[in-house]
Regions:
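Extended alpha-helical targeting/anchoring segments
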Residues: 1-275
Length: 275
């Protein structure tokens, strides 16, 4: 069973401390995560196959590196570049999936009507527009999808799509530099939010909130944000999950959101044990 890491500070207390900085005008939002650990090392390939079955997502990856193995099923694009068109697809706003189709629709409607979630989402859309604006041809930044619902195995998300024409004198590396790390994994303003994250999260994030993908010789790029990702190292599995903290965030609600986001990997682990 995944358990909150004993090294982590109590999540609800960190939410309260983060809100103090918001009230002081220090930040608008910070994405605070916590680590969940599984004191065993499942077969990474079986975990990957279980993830594909339980939580099929736009980005599925199995990466065996020197000391660690990453197994991920990420729903979120970090940044994409295809034939000169740059795209961000921020996710902000989460609800658990309903047990019935009717309950699922009710939860989706509730998410779309939640003023707190909408305000948080629009702020991150603006952050994404600003990031792209630094590398875009003048006047080409546009929001093509705004606050639509995407459903996954255990949660549903509110998602938008932002795109632009990349300036002709720039390339994929310039685009990555302008947009990384994703605002949906840091908060706003980015730098100050990251400073507070470094203070409140007692352990390094590791791969969480980074990016996995490719940059091709043709100049195209497609990177996923490393969320819903298990990191297996030294006979221990770790997965991080976070929530965006704003002025009216409820500490208990945000804590439950992190658990809901970690559930897909928990279910994959259970499937391995049953097989």
């Amino acid at each position: 069973v995944l358990k909150v890491s004993p090294q982590a500070l109590p999540y609800q207390e960190v939410v309260k401390k983060t809100k103090e900085h918001i009230y002081q005008g220090d930040i608008i939002q910070a994405v605070i995560s916590q680590p969940f650990v599984y004191e065993s090392s499942p077969d990474p390939w079986l975990l990957y196959r279980a993830q594909r079955y339980i939580n099929p997502s736009p980005y599925l990856y199995f990466m065996k590196l020197d000391d660690i193995t990453l197994v991920g099923s990420s729903p979120e694009t970090m940044v994409r570049l295809e034939n000169g068109i740059a795209t961000l697809r921020p996710i902000a706003g989460t609800r658990p999936r309903g047990k019935t189709e009717k309950q699922d629709r009710t939860l989706a409607d509730e998410l779309l009507k939640d003023e707190k979630e909408k305000a948080e989402h629009l702020m991150l859309v603006d952050l994404g527009r600003n990031d792209l604006g630094r590398v875009a041809e003048t006047g080409t930044v546009q929001v093509t999808d705004l606050m639509i619902i995407e459903r996954y195995s255990h949660v549903m998300h509110m998602v938008s799509n932002i795109c632009c024409d990349l300036r002709s004198d720039l390339n994929a590396w310039d685009l990555l530099k302008a947009t990384f790390p994703a605002g949906t994994l840091t908060g706003a303003p980015k730098v100050r939010a990251m400073e507070l994250i470094s203070r409140f999260e007692t352990e390094p994030r590791g791969p969480y909130g980074g990016a996995v993908g490719y940059i091709s010789f043709s100049g195209n790029m497609d990177l996923a944000i490393t969320i819903r990702t298990a990191c297996i190292e030294k006979n221990c599995l770790t997965v991080r999950a976070g929530a965006g903290i704003v002025a009216d965030s409820d500490p208990d609600t945000e804590y439950v959101e992190t658990i809901n986001k970690a559930m897909a990997i928990q279910k994959a682990l259970e499937l391995i044990q049953q097989s």
